[in-house]
Curated annotation (Swiss-Prot):
PANTHER family hit by this protein: BROAD-SPECIFICITY PHOSPHATASE YOR283W-RELATED (PTHR48100), HISTIDINE PHOSPHATASE FAMILY PROTEIN-RELATED (PTHR48100:SF1)
Protein name per UniProt: Probable phosphoglycerate mutase GpmB
Domain of life, per lineage: Bacteria
Top-tier EC class: isomerase
Pathway where it operates: Carbohydrate degradation; glycolysis; pyruvate from D-glyceraldehyde 3-phosphate: step 3/5
Active-site residues (renumbered): 9, 82
EC number: 5.4.2.-
Chain positions recorded as substrate binding sites: 8-15, 21-22, 58, 60, 82-85, 104-105, 151-152
């Protein structure tokens, strides 16, 4: 049975400023770097053999820190990027007009094919995330990969594995540097294919996530 670990990147400057990142980028904060080191300490005990990351800077830096702890190299895969947020990227959430907030809400409230102008739909995101996950099945036997990606992207992946449509209301919280695990199984008793073992584990982190403090 293949086990795949899923990690959201560490806290970034724009996370702290409540700016929309999407496929734009901002660096990890000092707290985000510490979170990544704590993932690395946990990952060191898991027998990780491959670290595959979104090619955006915040995920690359998170992956590099984890890789140093695990003694692995880092492989970049653009399919693991965050949802393209189109014309709203780099904007402060509190600056959105009523119309713009309506576009953003369509991505989280169950609107079929909701998208921000010049952006990506949740279905398009789901298709590329599942393709990236499926490529793990081509790794050598005994591999245990760890994928570093983004909050909306990983939430969409895990939710669709559970059978929800890609555009379903977002009800899965994956905090910065949370760890999830999905397994690929072939069983006569349980559902064959991808199953969710854990989602959003933050027990390895020693401080509350930024979004916990902002609520």
């Amino acid at each position: 049975m293949l086990q795949v670990y899923l990690v959201r990147h560490g806290e970034t400057q724009w996370n702290a400023e409540r700016r929309i990142q999407g496929q734009s980028d901002s660096p990890l904060t000092a707290h985000g770097e510490r979170q990544a080191w704590q993932v690395g300490e946990r990952a060191r005990t898991l027998g990780i053999t491959h670290i595959i990351t979104s090619d955006l800077g915040r995920t690359r830096r998170t992956a590099e820190i984890i890789a140093e702890a695990c003694g692995c190299s880092v492989i970049a895969d653009a399919r693991l990027r965050e949802l393209d947020m189109g014309v709203l990227e780099k904007r402060h959430i509190d600056s959105l007009s009523e119309e713009e907030e309506g576009w953003r809400r369509q991505l989280v409230n169950g609107t079929p094919d909701g998208r921000i102008p010049q952006g990506e739909s949740m279905q398009e995101l789901s298709e590329r995330m599942h393709a990236a996950l499926a490529s793990c099945l081509e790794l050598p036997a005994g591999s245990r990969p760890l994928l570093v990606s983004h909050g909306i992207a990983l939430g969409c992946l895990v939710s669709t594995i559970l059978g929800l449509p890609a555009y379903a209301e977002r009800r899965l919280r994956l905090r910065n540097c949370s760890i999830s695990r999905v397994d690929y199984q072939q069983s006569p008793w349980l559902a064959s294919g991808w199953v969710v073992e854990t989602a959003g584990d933050v027990s390895h982190l020693d401080a509350p996530a930024m979004d916990e403090l902002q609520r």
